[in-house]
């Protein structure tokens, strides 16, 4: 209902409905099984390469084995379907005791950065409705990052700044929402920086 109440939410649902339209359960299973095989093989290759050379770079790994085959196919039973993570991980056990929320997410929302602010605000409101109306919500602002493809004239390097702005705007316009800056913590062509200690310490400083 919350997603259907806004244009951004309806767009999110429409993309999902288009992705699954006209497919049978057999097709969903075949797509998922084929993806899982590719994903497992890729992970095995990466693990073996890192064991052989702990200092191997992602640039080298991507050249040898290609980019990670992510995301998985969209299916009605996927954990990444609309509201899937909420239904599977939160709704069944909420509300449990907590002091606030730590949110480090947004990397894969790059294609839909224009609606991210609205969807993030809806998420904060929905979660607070379950737990407490004014629970602190701490956002890790996306770090510096440039995909190698951008240097090869593909992609748009200005989409992540739009996401950062949306995260910042949420903190400025919603009570008890805060942003932790990590613009100095990113890594070239590595969407998940190795350094997690720095963001963790900054979150702790803000929370405590």
Residue positions per predicted region:
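Cell-envelope and extracellular/periplasmic
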Residues: 1-208
């Amino acid at each position: 209902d919350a997603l259907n109440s806004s244009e951004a939410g309806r767009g999110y649902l429409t993309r999902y409905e288009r992705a699954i339209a006209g497919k049978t359960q057999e097709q969903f299973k075949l797509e998922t099984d084929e993806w899982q095989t590719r994903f497992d093989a890729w992970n095995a290759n990466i693990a073996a390469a890192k064991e052989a050379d702990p200092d191997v770079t992602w640039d080298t790994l991507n050249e040898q084995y290609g980019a990670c085959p992510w995301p998985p196919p969209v299916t009605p039973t996927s954990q990444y379907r609309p509201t899937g993570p909420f239904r599977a991980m939160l709704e069944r056990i909420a509300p449990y005791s907590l002091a606030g929320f730590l949110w480090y997410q947004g990397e894969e929302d790059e294609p839909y950065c224009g609606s991210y602010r609205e969807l993030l605000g809806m998420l904060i409101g929905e979660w607070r409705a379950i737990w407490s109306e004014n629970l602190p919500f701490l956002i890790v602002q996306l770090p510096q990052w440039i995909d190698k493809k951008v240097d090869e004239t593909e992609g748009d390097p200005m989409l992540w700044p739009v996401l950062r702005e949306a995260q910042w705007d949420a903190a400025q316009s919603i009570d008890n929402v805060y942003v932790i800056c990590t613009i100095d913590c990113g890594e070239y062509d590595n969407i998940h920086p190795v350094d997690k200690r720095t963001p963790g310490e900054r979150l702790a400083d803000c929370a405590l």
